[in-house]
Amino acid sequence: MIDYKNTLNLPETGFPMRGDLAKREPDMLKNWYDKNLYQKVRESSKGKKSFILHDGPPYANGNIHIGHAVNKILKDIIMKSKTALGFDTPYVPGWDCHGLPIELKVEGIVGKPNEKISAAEFRQACRDYAKEQVEGQKADFIRMGILGDWDNPYLTMNFDTEAHIIRTLGKVIANGHLYKGSKPVHWCLDCGSSLAEAEVEYEDKVSPSIYVRFKAVDSVAVEAKFNAVGKGSGQISAVIWTTTPWTLPSNKAISINPEFDYQLVQFGGERVVLVKDLVESVQKAVGIESVEVLGEVKGDALELMQFQHPFYDYSVPLILGDHVTTDGGTGLVHTAPDHGQDDFVVSKKYNIEMAGLVANDGKFISSTPFFAGLGVFESNEKVLEKLKEVGALLKLERIKHSYPHCWRHKTPIIFRATPQWFIGMETQGLREQALGEIKSVRWIPSWGEARIDTMVANRPDWCISRQRTWGVPMTMFVHNETEELHPRTLEILESVAKRVEEKGIQAWWDLDPVEVLGEEDAKNYRKVPDTLDVWFDSGSTYASVVEARPEFNGNSTDMYLEGSDQHRGWFMSSLMLSTATNGKAPYKQVLTHGFVVDEKGRKMSKSLGNVIVPSEVWNKNGADILRLWVASTDYTGEIAVSHNILNSAGESYRRIRNTARFLLANLNGFDPKRDLVKPEEMIALDRWAVSCALEAQNDIKEAYDNYQFHTVVQRLMRFCSIEMGSFYLDIIKDRQYTTKADSLARRSCQTALWHIAEALVRWMAPILSFTADEIWSYLPQVEGRSEFVFTEEFYEGLFGLTEADKLDDAYWQQILKVRAESNRVLEQARKDKVIGSGLEAKVTLYANNEIRAMLEQLGNELRFVLITSQAIIKPLSEADVAEGEMAGLAVKVERAEGEKCPRCWHFATDIGTHTEHSSVCGRCVENVAGEGEKRSFA
């Protein structure tokens, strides 16, 4: 008896069913490194139009978290997809290496500078620590399959980068944007330094909430202003509200809004001045049963009226400020120019000087009456006691409210006026110019434009100086008496930059001023001791990296991509510096992603036990699962992750992998050079399948080009699961396995599968990089083929249907609907035990004229599309079963006629009619012993 199994073309491939990614990926990474994959990608793209995504530098401290993974994977998907779209995509990863967090870590190891260790040794310890942190993070980024110039990253502590940062400072000075002044800045008592806006977090804090009386210096004059002479009784006070009693010793004025209506009100046994709109709310807060309005006047009429400071022997004026609102309080704002930005600005208009009572350590200086030596927060209670003692405290409560905290120490900070260096927002029209540049940028998502526009419109001048040890120095000299910059500052900066380029920032601290100033000037000028804000470091990388490194060929940056918190961080600092130095934005597009939360929308937290550690994911599931999860998510909002969500990504991965494996297994023995069938000679269904792939590719390319990666994944899944998995790949199994190995019927099918596989692997590569690389190695080899899929552009061998194709896409879409209806009835027949599998069925399709004419075009091949042994078409009028879910069609299922063929498993009535092959059907006889069956459609 003949063993017909050997006559079948059974699928065969070495491509494993299981990904086993956690085990295989490291070997692939080694191969990529050994073969210098990144350089191969660069070489393959030489001469093409560039696309530059400038890497925002993560801070070189600690292990990477899931947010880092999202950020770097999104960047990698963009770079790989841009390569496939025909761009040259240099990618230089970077790290932010200076600043306080590293200082604090190093202090814990070696002690504070100039105590147990010299400042120079401390800086070297910081450099060594940062280098170690970079190496750890770098290994993790590489493990995720991120391609880049990992052997030559940019570090803000590289000597050449430090020198370029100094040169950027020089350009800021040259363009007239730098000034020195005493202004209130965010000040961390633990850091002993100012903080950037982006280094401030808001947390809940319990504070005293107090209403305070400032007695009128001249009650009669106040009565007269309110046209209320002789009205009411008791002392007259202006009432302010504050949650920072410690700032009252520095009070120099009370601000009111010139446009608001203010009232003199009888409050029990006293008279108070309040804004009209808040009288009722203050009455309730203070607990006064009844009030009487004695007079009313516009705020501007009260300008410069004098009121007595609650506990110091001086009076303070009422001054006018637009910052005063009726959102809360009393409409009269306690104004301490040392401790608030609005306070400072409005006081400056009236030439009101700052008090200067709080030292760097957050304690009141020794000359401060009543509070000398006390820390500011410690002094709150003492101030309250003093207010009670002098009868100035109208009301005291304790409230929980949002208060600024240091991002690193998590402790409350203060506003404090100190001599600092600033980039002026109004100087040389910087604010207006930056606002104009924002409009020239494409913001993704679009709401990013309004967000940064508001921030730039309202931000204060940028304090760029810090009082730290580990940072790029502000390499300037100021006159000992006048504090003016040296007249040769720009020349000196360049001279110092060259030294830093050779020896790093320590060259500045070791520099003898005589070397650059000469003997005489060295006596009259001193070094500025400050370092630059780390946001200046990273904000100037458009110059220190993109403009400076040769691989960027002088091209400007196309994209910045970071988390949405960077509107006030890196996007902002980069915009300010680039506009100040180059007169334009440093980027053409800015893409932001949301923060990672758990499946319930909660932040990642150890206490909640919902933290997903990236390394645990790739060690268990593989990095491709992490990459697929990132790509599957709409990154414009919050990005949800959990073990369940990752498991779901794993299921999607398996569907894609199974599709790829089916393609590879059925390309067994296929040599494109020898076996490829011309499009016009291919079977109709195969041509349609290739046209489906072309349509999918067009959708996928458009989605990649618009950074809509979740759309890419959805389209990829639809193609694998619906168009291929549940239709085309299902139908072709019979033809692929049972027809002659070298027949047109089979080679046509393999040609389609090969085109589809060549396209599919390229679609996957930006997202499922490891799996795409693995698939690439199993595809049939062709002459001149690249070693890696990552050097390839999207596949150009796909083709669409033409006018010559009678069975067009609309036709096959209708066939899909007929098949869905047939499957529905077959499934019911299976449940009713009429049949076991579809091949045990004979289906009769009762169709209206239109559907009948369509189905008849397939002739005897309709049964292959329906995957039944027999298929008969009859007029709908003859139906003895009801129409189903498709109008104009009724499907009847019966058991197939004849016997089951052991070779093809179809039921046939001609088994036993062939002498030599009596056990198989006539079709199989033709495929085994004859010229092979002919197929035209399916």
Swiss-Prot record:
Residues spanned by motif 'HIGH' region: 58-68
GO biological process, one term: isoleucyl-tRNA aminoacylation
Record keywords: Aminoacyl-tRNA synthetase, ATP-binding, Cytoplasm, Ligase, Metal-binding, Nucleotide-binding, Protein biosynthesis, Zinc
GO cellular component: cytosol
Cofactor(s) listed in the protein's UniProt record: Zn(2+)
Motif ('KMSKS' region): 603-607
Catalytic activity line of the entry: tRNA(Ile) + L-isoleucine + ATP = L-isoleucyl-tRNA(Ile) + AMP + diphosphate
Chain sites annotated for binding ATP: K606
Residues annotated as binding Zn(2+): C901, C904, C921, C924
EC number: 6.1.1.5
Domain remark in the UniProt entry: IleRS has two distinct active sites: one for aminoacylation and one for editing. The misactivated valine is translocated from the active site to the editing site, which sterically excludes the correctly activated isoleucine. The single editing site contains two valyl binding pockets, one specific for each substrate (Val-AMP or Val-tRNA(Ile)).
NCBIfam families in alphabetical order: ileS
Function: Catalyzes the attachment of isoleucine to tRNA(Ile). As IleRS can inadvertently accommodate and process structurally similar amino acids such as valine, to avoid such errors it has two additional distinct tRNA(Ile)-dependent editing activities. One activity is designated as 'pretransfer' editing and involves the hydrolysis of activated Val-AMP. The other activity is designated 'posttransfer' editing and involves deacylation of mischarged Val-tRNA(Ile).
HAMAP family registered for this protein in UniProt: Ile_tRNA_synth_type1 (MF_02002)
Similarity comment: Belongs to the class-I aminoacyl-tRNA synthetase family. IleS type 1 subfamily.
The protein's name: Isoleucine--tRNA ligase
Lineage of source species: Bacteria, Pseudomonadati, Pseudomonadota, Gammaproteobacteria, Pasteurellales
